[in-house]
Amino acid sequence: MTDQTPTLLLASSSPFRRQLLDKLKLDFIHQSPDIDESRHEDESPTALVMRLAREKALALADQHPNTLIIGSDQVAVIGNQVLGKPGDRDTAIRQLSAASGKRVSFLTGLCLLNTATGRSQVVCDPFHVQFRTLKPAQIERYVDIEQPLNCAGSFKSEGLGIVLFKALEGRDPNTLVGLPLIILTEFLAAEGVQLPL
């Protein structure tokens, strides 16, 4: 980035999102925002992830003038049930048991906030996963091996989690990991950021 180009900041503590953003070969910094991620009453999953992505970016805006802040949030949805990060083994096993044999939608909210202009671009990018029918012992083994306790839906698609799936459907496979790079590059281009290619 040049001196005239705003700093790029990833508003996340996720190592997975940092690894994804590294793919773009852009210099960036990262910082974890401190926000309440509770779902509002009657808030749709789409509205939830878009709001949280924007709030994550806004939470760091005052500290970072002339910065492009990337906020992102993801939930898994089975029917009307929203699944977040399990946090513990038992919840991960319950989430994967609920997903067994079903189609699960992963909704990723993405926000790019320009703190110099106040302009924000916000979107929800869906990605769908058809899970294989899984036996309880398979689920327990997977959770014990991969420890997906900080991942929405209780799996890591970039690792052993891929064996849990029958089919994938979506615009950008990076969305499943938590950062839709195709849309992000469009947002960055709209802000005048020159990508390496």
Swiss-Prot record:
Domain of life the protein comes from: Bacteria
Membership in a protein family: Belongs to the Maf family. YceF subfamily.
Cofactor(s) it depends on: a divalent metal cation
Signal sequence coordinates: none
Protein name per the record: 7-methyl-GTP pyrophosphatase
Active-site residues annotated for this sequence: D73
InterPro entries tied to this protein: ITPase-like_fam, Maf-like
Subcellular location(s) of the protein: Cytoplasm
Organism from which the protein derives: Alcanivorax borkumensis (strain ATCC 700651 / DSM 11573 / NCIMB 13689 / SK2)
Function: Nucleoside triphosphate pyrophosphatase that hydrolyzes 7-methyl-GTP (m(7)GTP). May have a dual role in cell division arrest and in preventing the incorporation of modified nucleotides into cellular nucleic acids.
One term under GO cellular component: cytoplasm
Enzyme Commission numbers on file: 3.6.1.-
Site (Important for substrate specificity) residue list: F16, Q74, E158
Alphabetic keyword roster: Cytoplasm, Hydrolase, Nucleotide metabolism
Enzymatic class: hydrolase
Lineage, broadest ranks: Bacteria, Pseudomonadati, Pseudomonadota, Gammaproteobacteria, Oceanospirillales
GO biological process: nucleotide metabolic process
Catalyzed chemical reaction(s): N(7)-methyl-GTP + H2O = N(7)-methyl-GMP + diphosphate + H(+)
GO molecular function: nucleoside triphosphate diphosphatase activity
